[in-house]
Each structure stands twice: as C-alpha cells, then as structure tokens.
C-alpha cells in the first residue's frame, strides 16, 4: 500500500505535502492524514531528487556557538536540538548540527556558500558576529535562539532581562541586600548581557548597590561556575545570595559554596536560570527561572522553515514571559 491509498488522497496531493510545495491550499486535516500515513509506512521523500527539482537541500543548519566541551556538559541544549529536529522532521527537512568555535564564528557561513543548508538556526548569537550580519544582508534565512539588539533578525527567546530581574527580586524579597551574580557566558554574548541587565535593574529599583565586583563570569560549564564562585567568596563584604544565570554553571558554584563550609540557603541563597531537568534533583533543589527549551527549539525550527518556504511572517519572532520556579536553594 502506498501513502496516497492509505491517506485516501491523490498522489499529487501527497507530493505537494511531502515536498512542501508553496502556494498550494491543503487543509490541516488532509496534511496530517498524509504525514501520518507516510510515518506509518516509513516513507521518506528522496532528498537528492527534491534538491534537483527545487534547488533546495531541505536541510537547516543548527549552529551552536560553543566549544565541544561546553556542548557536551550542557543539559539545556539537547532539549533545544530535539525541538528543532522534531519541527524539521514534521516538514520533511533534515538538520545539520554544526558546533562552532566561539572564536571562529565565521566558519558556519560555509554551510550556506557550499549549498549544504537552506537556512540557519543559530544558538548563542554574539554582538560582534560579522559573519552573521553578512549572511543577513544577503537575505539568507536565519532564526536566532536569543535576541540580537539593533537588528531585525527573527528570534525565539524567553525575556531574559525580565527573568533575571524576577530571580533577583525573589532574593530581595527574602531579605538579601548583598547579592552576587555569576553570568552564564562571557559578556560579549547577548544572553549574558541581558541577564546582567536584569540583575542590575532589580538592584537599582530596590536602591541596593550594583557593585561590579559582585559580578563574575561563567562560561557555560560547571568548572567555570566553581572558579567564579570561589572568586566571589573572596569579595568583601561577602554576598549572602547569588544569582547564577545558568543551571549548569550553578552545579560548580554550589560545590564551591559547600567546599567553603557554607550552607545553602542559610549562609548563601542560590537562584539559577534555565530550569534544566536536573535542577529539581540538586542538593538542595534549585530555585530557577524556567526556559521551555524544547518548545523554543521547535518554534524556532518551524518558523525558520516557513521563512525558507517563502511565507511572509508577521510573527516570525517569539518572546515568552519568564517564570520563577521556587525550590529549597533560596527559601
């Protein structure tokens, strides 16, 4: 039995749906019936043949601007990757994963110039990424995981500034007046800047000192959190609470707090950011800002494919509200 017979439609309709032909009006119910039939029969369109006909590769490049060590220790990114892959699979696209050295971001431009992908989903944009801006000027379809200020490149993100402000306000409401911060990444990354700005905003509204000595840089890994926390513990006066802008970085920071003989939260309250699956199993369970990693990956992948297919999107970008998840590390 072929897909057309199982779905009770013509072979032309099957071809339109599985090849994502633009400009064809097909109901959502019919589209779902065809995709379900194709899945049941383990049918996959011939990508090489589609490329010859359309000039497209039916592949999107998922670019991760982090080192392999950072990617392998990150509990957040796998959920993003899974979301992108699910969105792509539902539309008959493939995903090409491309880790990029943070100091050589231009390397991913070859994915486009060598005709490997039809568009790029980029996680962790940097303010000084010239290759990204060059591709944007060339009208290459791009979707960012995280906002890039002063550009019109579409993105999916949680309001990181508001989330950081929410996290620090929680600590202020618990009576803390000396609050440190460890960033998720170096401060040339926009995500780190946004979370730092939220930290500062909360302190200023509460008329508390915004001391730069209380901010230490993390770099996506537990090891960076451990070193940053050791440095923060040397600051006078020592903070009684810390906002750590990444749950993964918080793993190392919590270890440093315990090695210093301090108790959480009595001596040092801790709030993280991301709400990775392991956060509720930390010792103690981690108060954190929730990021729907899978949902952001899926939404970004789905929107990118619609852009590739030539759909005019007024809602290409997606900015979600932040949500505080309260656990024992801060109360």
Predicted regions and their residues:
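N-terminal helix-turn-helix DNA-binding module of bacterial transcription factors
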Residues: 1-58, 331
């Amino acid at each position: 039995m072929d897909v057309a017979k199982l779905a009770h439609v013509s072979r032309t309709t099957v071809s339109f749906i599985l090849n994502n032909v633009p400009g064809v009006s097909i109901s959502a119910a019919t589209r779902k019936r065809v995709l379900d039939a194709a899945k049941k029969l383990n049918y996959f369109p011939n990508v090489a043949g589609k490329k010859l006909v359309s000039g497209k590769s039916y592949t999107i490049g998922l670019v991760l601007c982090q080192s392999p060590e950072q990617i392998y220790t990150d509990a957040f990114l796998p959920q993003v990757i899974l979301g992108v892959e699910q969105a792509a699979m539902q539309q008959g696209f493939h995903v090409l994963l491309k880790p990029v050295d943070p100091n050589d971001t231009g390397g991913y431009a070859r994915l486009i110039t060598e005709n490997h992908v039809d568009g790029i989903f980029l996680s962790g944009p940097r303010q000084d990424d010239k290759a990204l801006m060059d591709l944007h000027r060339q009208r290459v379809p791009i979707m960012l995981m995280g906002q890039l200020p002063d550009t019109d490149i579409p993105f999916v993100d949680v309001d990181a500034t508001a989330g950081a402000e929410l996290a620090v306000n929680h600590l202020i409401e618990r009576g803390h007046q000396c609050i440190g911060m460890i960033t998720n990444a170096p401060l040339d990354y926009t995500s780190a800047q946004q979370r730092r700005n939220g930290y500062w905003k909360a302190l200023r509204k509460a008329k508390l000192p915004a001391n730069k000595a209380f901010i230490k840089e993390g770099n996506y890994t537990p090891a960076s959190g451990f070193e940053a926390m050791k440095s923060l513990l040397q600051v006078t006066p020592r903070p009684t609470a810390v906002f750590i802008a990444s749950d993964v970085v918080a793993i190392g920071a919590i270890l440093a707090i315990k090695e210093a003989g301090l108790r959480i939260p009595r001596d040092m309250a801790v709030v993280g950011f991301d709400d990775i699956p392991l956060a509720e199993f930390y010792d103690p369970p981690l108060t954190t800002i929730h990021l729907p990693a899978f949902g952001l990956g899926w939404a970004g992948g789905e929107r990118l494919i619609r852009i590739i297919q030539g759909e005019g999107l007024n809602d290409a970008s997606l900015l979600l509200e932040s949500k505080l998840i309260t656990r024992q590390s801060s109360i």
